[in-house]
């Protein structure tokens, strides 16, 4: 896992808008900050994915403040920023090509929303053959209604998304497990 690309997905101010509702993992940003500090100290690659929506009403629309990165996850000079317009960081972005050209074969993924952009990106990474680790406590989501109209909590949605991914597309780990593995 040493030297894996830390891929941070959609950590923008828009995710804090009250329209989203109640989220899980309130300390996700702290875990992401710990990972970022380690990656930067070790000079390992940190890549940022930014969602740029073309929808006029979206909080992720470029050119307005909600589209900015959250301060605790803002890119430093020289850290690549991958702009995407879909929920998958590989679609239409050149991400796969850039990773392969750089000789990167392993990813550590954190960000939002677990069951949306994180899940679709991790599935694609696994399908493309990247050795992928998903940081469970470095992601979060929101409650939603299932197809039957039953309310599902953010914790339930998050857990199911992780279950969908673990073992087939990635290895789900905690930030502490990941950081301990590097000691």
Model-derived regions, located:
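A generic "binding-loop/recognition-motif" signal
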Residues: 11, 52, 114
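Short beta-strand segments at enzyme active-site cores
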Residues: 8, 44-51, 135
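Short acidic, Gly/Ser-rich segments with clustered Asp/Glu that frequently serve as metal-coordination loops
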Residues: 14-18
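A short alpha/beta connector and helix-capping loop motif
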Residues: 20-48
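Active-site-adjacent betaalpha module
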Residues: 1-5, 31-42, 59-183
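Small-residue-rich anion-binding loops in enzyme active sites
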Residues: 55
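Short, solvent-exposed loop/turn segments at secondary-structure boundaries
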Residues: 19-23, 58-62
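Alpha-helical bundle segments that constitute or directly flank the non-heme di-iron/ferroxidase center
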Residues: 6, 13
